[in-house]
Amino acid sequence: MRRTKEDAAKTRAHILDIALRLFGELGYSGASLSKIASAAKVTKGAIYWHFESKVDLYEQLIYEKSRQSFNELHGILSGPGRAADRLQQYLIRSFLLLAEDQSFRELQRVIIFKTEQLPELDAQIEQQKNSLRLLLDHLTEVIEEGKLDKSLKDNVQSADLAWEMLAFHNGVSNTWLLFPDSFPLEVKAEQIVKRFFESVVNHQN
C-alpha cells in the first residue's frame, strides 16, 4: 500500500510538471487533457484519477508550484527585524526566485502570459484577486510598523506605498519575463529595490 501511494504521488507530480510545460508552450486553451496525457505518457483516465477536471489541474498546479515560494516570502514579511528591511528583502527575494527558480518562473509565465480570460477560470481569477488584496493589506501593515519603528519616514502614506510596491514588483517581473536576456535580474535585484525605497527609508535611524 505504501508503495502504491508513493507511485501515485510521483505520477501526480509528473502530470503537474508536464502540464506546466504544455501550458507554457500552448497556452491554457491549447493544452488539452489529451495532449497532457500523451506528453506525460499516461492515460487520460490517470489524469482524472488525480484531478477532477482541467480547471482543477490548473488550480492545483498553481497551488503546488507556488506554495513553497509563497510561504518563504510570507515568512520574510512576518519575520523579525526592522520593517523597512523586511519589505526590501521581500522584493529582493521575490525577484531572485523569479530569476533562479525555473519552475516558479515558468509558472509566472503561464499565469501572466499564457492564461486566457475564460468563464471556467473566473473562480481562479477571483481567488488571485483576493490573494492580491490580502498581500496589499499585509504590506500596508508592515509599512505601518516601519513608521512606528522609525525605519520608514513618518510622512509615508502606507496604503499608497503598498500599491506602489505591488506595481513596481509586477512591472519589473513582467518586463523581465518578456526580455530575460536584457537585464541580469539576479545581479541587479538588490540595487533596484534599494533605489525604489530610497525616498521612503528613514536614513537617520
Where are these regions (language model features)?
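Base-recognition residues in the alpha-helical recognition helix of bacterial helix-turn-helix
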Residues: G24, Y48-E52, Q60, E64
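Hydrophobic alpha-helical connector segments
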Residues: Q60, E64, H74-F104, S158-M165, ...
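Hydrophobic alpha-helical bundle segments that form small-molecule/ligand-binding pockets
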Residues: D122, L132-L161, V200-N205
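Amphipathic, non-transmembrane alpha-helical scaffold segments
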Residues: L16, Y58, I62, S66, ...
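Short secondary-structure transition hinges
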Residues: L96-E141
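Hydrophobic alpha-helical segments that form the core
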Residues: D154-T175, K188-F196
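Key DNA-contact positions within bacterial/archaeal DNA-binding proteins
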Residues: G45
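Basic, helix-initiating cap at the start of DNA-binding domains
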Residues: M1-L26, G30-V42, D56
